[in-house]
């Protein structure tokens, strides 16, 4: 089963509360079950970008519209690659990479709407058609809406 997991935090990369712990344990546990292939998507926050222990490689980039703004979307993959669990980061300095905070900015709604739409665009770019789209907390809540509105024909089984 192909499972795309979308969250705003996951230990050890970034953790502000219990969600970070869950998102460290759950993808790892699911990846150990026979037949599962997991992709975890996280924002590429400044603290992740600046952590020398986290090594990534860019696997793609493109532009994406969000309302009135045309925005860069970078897709980075955690190195080294693992067979059944891939960790991807959505890179955009305006929304994530230049800020020292994870939450609490005046434009969090816009930031995470961008993140949700960028995850769907990244899944399409990577041609990873999930059987399950597992979205965690409000920051990822718009991802299924973008799936239905923009990517249903590409991925109707999800």
What are these regions (language model features)?
Residues 1-158:
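Catalytic cores of nucleotide-sugar-dependent glycosyltransferases that transfer UDP/GDP/TDP-activated
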């Amino acid at each position: 089963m192909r499972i795309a997991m979308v969250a705003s935090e996951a230990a050890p990369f970034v953790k502000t509360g219990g969600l970070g712990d869950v998102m460290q344990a759950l993808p790892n546990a699911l990846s150990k079950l026979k037949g599962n292939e997991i992709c975890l998507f996280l924002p590429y926050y400044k603290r992740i970008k600046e952590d020398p222990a986290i090594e990534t490689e860019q696997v793609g980039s493109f532009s994406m519209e969000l309302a009135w703004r045309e925005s860069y979307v970078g897709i980075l993959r955690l190195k080294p690659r693992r067979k059944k669990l891939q960790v991807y980061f959505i890179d955009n300095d305006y929304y994530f990479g230049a800020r020292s905070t994870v939450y609490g900015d005046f434009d969090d709604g816009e930031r995470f709407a961008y993140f949700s739409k960028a995850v769907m665009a990244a899944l399409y770019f990577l041609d990873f058609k999930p059987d399950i789209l597992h979205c965690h907390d409000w920051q990822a809540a718009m991802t299924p809406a973008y799936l239905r509105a923009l990517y249903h024909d590409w991925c109707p089984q999800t």
